[in-house]
From Swiss-Prot:
SUPFAM superfamilies: Nudix (SSF55811)
Described purpose of this protein according to its UniProt entry: Accelerates the degradation of transcripts by removing pyrophosphate from the 5'-end of triphosphorylated RNA, leading to a more labile monophosphorylated state that can stimulate subsequent ribonuclease cleavage.
InterPro entries with a match to the protein in the record: Nudix_hydrolase, NUDIX_hydrolase-like_dom_sf, NUDIX_hydrolase_CS, NUDIX_hydrolase_dom, RppH
Enzyme Commission number(s): 3.6.1.-
Keyword Phosphoprotein: no
CDD domains: NUDIX_Ap4A_hydrolase_plant_like (cd03671)
Residue ranges of every copy of the Nudix hydrolase domain listed in the record: 7-149
Protein name: RNA pyrophosphohydrolase
Keyword Hydrolase: yes
Keywords: Hydrolase
Signal peptide location: none
Amino acid sequence: MVEQKDKYRPCVGIMLFNRQGHAFIGKRFESDSYWQMPQGGVDDGEELEQAALRELLEEVGTNKVKVITKSKDWIYYNLPEEVIPICWNGKYSGQKQRWFLMKFCGEDEDIDINYTGHPEFKEWRWQGIDSLVASAISFKKEVYKTVIEEFSSIIKASTISS
């Protein structure tokens, strides 16, 4: 399938993992069923890593991280048809994301999902990477599978060497 690349909002995603190799996930306010990793749009003129660190601070409330790597390619997903008019005034049919793998170097107390006063998440937890896909909303499951496939060996190597 050929995608119309300009119909996808440029975005970054962050897989933040702790010393145990578990990933940070948050439960959004509009859902009681789905959890997600931090993500957000790239501002005009903003470098991707800069956007990822900004989004992490805004959504997770910490900068106590080490950037390990980023995904080799953009990862695309489509929004469900009924959601397109609601998100970004129908300008985009989905998102294209570059994912960053970051190691959390702080303590749980260093995480503050209310950091901005306008939180994205109502609660958070660390979750094993093998069960992340099951916690995600349906249209993001393939993205999470791709991210896990690309980053899981790096996470395992990092937790062994810590």
